[in-house]
Each structure stands twice: as structure tokens, then as C-alpha cells.
Amino acid sequence: MDLSKFEQRLECLESRMAFQERTIEELNQVVTEQQMEITKLREHLRLMTERLKATQPSMIASQSEETPPPHY
């Protein structure tokens, strides 16, 4: 191969590498934003779960409220 073909291949590889680096940076930004959103949603879910537990009585009776079985 002559020098010009090597230069063309090198330019092509450099171009592809630059494109891949840009793509990786963009994907990293998306992942970071999604992680922040997941963290926020988890906190909202935790708060909603606490509110739901506080407003609704438990469907399971405590042992003191439970009636004994009929054979007692």
C-alpha cells in the first residue's frame, strides 16, 4: 500500500473515533439524566408509600383483635 492509502485509512479511523467519542459523551449525559430521574422517582414512591400507609388502616387485624377459631 502506498502512503496516501494509509493516510486515508488513518483519517477514516480518526473520524470514526471522534464520532464514537461524541456518541459516548451524549449517551453518558442521557444515562446521568435518567439516573437522576430514577432517584427522584424512588423518593416520590417512598413518600407515596408512607402516605398510603398512614392514611389506610391495615387490612390485617392484630392478634388482640382477632377472634379465636370456632373450636375454642
From Swiss-Prot:
Pfam families: SlyX. Residues 53-72 are annotated as: Disordered. Residues 55-66 have a biased composition (Polar residues). PANTHER family: PROTEIN SLYX (PTHR36508:SF1). Belongs to the SlyX family. This is Protein SlyX. The gene is slyX.
